[in-house]
């Protein structure tokens, strides 16, 4: 079998075998899933050094369209394959401990393997039609996957909403593919080069952009992600919305914006506006959430804004920053969802108001969560800072080239990072640093099957920040150089680039050492500690009642003048395109309902009118045919 097929075929077959293994047989599914993911990862690593690589076979003929099973390995797809399969392997290992008896392991592991297989197929597809098929397969798998959640009502609602919104975007993508075939006569991505200079090409690009942005989760096509988070199994959120969908959505957006289409300032501005609105809007929603999974889902949306903003600038360093942020987001967002799953596994809840004081009981989970929180907030020296810094630098360069409104987008990006950090202060305090409720006195650290993937991802957050030159030169620079002809190899280097991560890390370490010394001296000083006066009652009786969580820190933000209107509109689902579409649909439904009066003669009249219209259309077509002859 050609090596390019292994990341697709092996997980697909392993998933089928997992589905066929009887439920009463223990351990076989886990071994099959782990082996399938590991094989796919090894093959992906081997493929990275072999691009460009092609595989083409005749498939099916549809009229004048000869559909081929056309795969093409380029640098972008090669590096995305590695991280798609790496995350798949980590989540599989994690699930071996997280999964409980109440879940159907047959379907769970089968869906996980099939999701990775479909992802690899989409990344490797050179044919737009083949990409669309794998794209739709992943949508169906997500629908089935979310339905596996233990909260049946929330899972069903989230799955339905995800399927409708992603199905709509898939339809837009299908229409774009059809329009490309009609006018340009090719579906090969490597052969297409479309200048966006008229309404036709503009609408084709916008349709493909909608498909990419919905998959990635950018506003206003984002609400399926928080809906899925309410009921989906936590590892599913770590695998698909946090990792796979970000890889695929931004991969397609970058391919159409940098390779397939040549877009002008208008569409670039549209991308930048979408990016800035997504950054600020989603992080404002994250601030007021009380469920950890829903909070993380809004942050998953917010981070997409940096990727879209970077690509939209058209500046090489910002494009590189957007793509690098895609990679970084896959790492730390997966880690955050796995951390949430670890908390959920040990405490039975993800409600931040019911948590507290877990740092001593779950030290590994606390440390990796803190690393991921600092990374997503853009705090140096972690990986999230480097990619955000590159986007900021690109925006400043855009201003130097004469774009006077650059500061609006720069402020939005910086403001988003500040609010992200504020949000995770709440998470860390409420979950780990606050007072532990008595109901959580039994909590212990998760098993090594769950902590190992989290530790690996936390280390990547550090390595890709401190030694950012390596991933940028190895993964990102060839993509940008191939697309715009400019190298970004020197932007992060020792003393020679815009940002010196190693030197900054040294300064941070020195600061931490000085702080530790000051803290140590403080330990030796004597201080008087008194009991809190609570009206003479016994403290033990009211300890849980006096449990103050971090969520209260941001309780007043809803009433602040700049944000009050935003939150009111959000509660009314003004920004939920699914809800808005439903309201518009209800108007048509009510109009049609008025025609269904229950009177038989009225129904017969409608049938006669419809039949007459059909007969008229057929006779008109026949008459035109006869006249033409």
Which ranges hold each PLM region?
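Aromatic-capped, Gly/Pro-kinked transmembrane alpha-helices
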Residues: 241, 471-507, 516-629
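Transmembrane helix-loop-helix hairpins at membrane boundaries of multipass inner-membrane proteins
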Residues: 1-6, 16-110, 185-196, 477, ...
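Alpha-helical transmembrane segments and their helix-start/interface "positive-inside/aromatic belt" motifs
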Residues: 26-37, 158-167, 360-369, 444-460, ...
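Hydrophobic alpha-helical membrane-insertion segments
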Residues: 34-48, 169-175, 369-380, 453-473, ...
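Hydrophobic transmembrane alpha-helices and their helix-loop junctions in integral membrane proteins
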Residues: 90-106, 116-131, 141-446
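Cytosolic juxtamembrane amphipathic/interface segments immediately preceding
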Residues: 66-69, 353-354, 437-442, 494, ...
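Hydrophobic alpha-helical transmembrane segments
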Residues: 71-85, 201-212, 406-417, 492-515
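Membrane-helix interface motif
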Residues: 49-58, 179-187, 379-396, 466-487, ...
